[in-house]
A protein has these predicted regions:
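Short basic helix-loop element that most often maps to the first helix and adjoining turn
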Residues: 3-22
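Short, Lys/Arg-enriched C-terminal cap helix and immediately downstream tail that follows
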Residues: 8, 42-43, 56
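Short amphipathic helical patch at the helix-1/turn junction of helix-turn-helix
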Residues: 10, 38-39
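Short C-terminal boundary/hinge segments that cap the last helix of small helical domains
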Residues: 19, 53-65
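Recognition helix of helix-turn-helix/homeodomain-like DNA-binding domains
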Residues: 25-38
Length: 65
């Protein structure tokens, strides 16, 4: 799944490690989310969206097959 996490994180001057700490996940999880190798749980998706004051749809781009 494509995300705008990296774009939002950089715009807000937040490191991967800082975001990971705030979300309660590892830095590797944030890296995997940014590269589209991992799909966030619903809970994590809400937390990330809330962190950036965005809706889930603004952060995570869902593409139907």
């Amino acid at each position: 799944m494509e995300t705008k996490i990296q774009e939002l994180r950089k715009a807000n001057k937040i490191s991967q490690a800082e975001l990971a700490d705030e979300m309660g996940v590892t830095r590797q999880t944030i890296i995997s989310l940014e590269k589209g190798r991992y799909n966030a749980s619903l809970e994590l998706a809400f937390k990330i969206a809330r962190c950036f004051r965005k809706t889930i749809e603004e952060v995570f781009i869902f593409e139907e097959d």
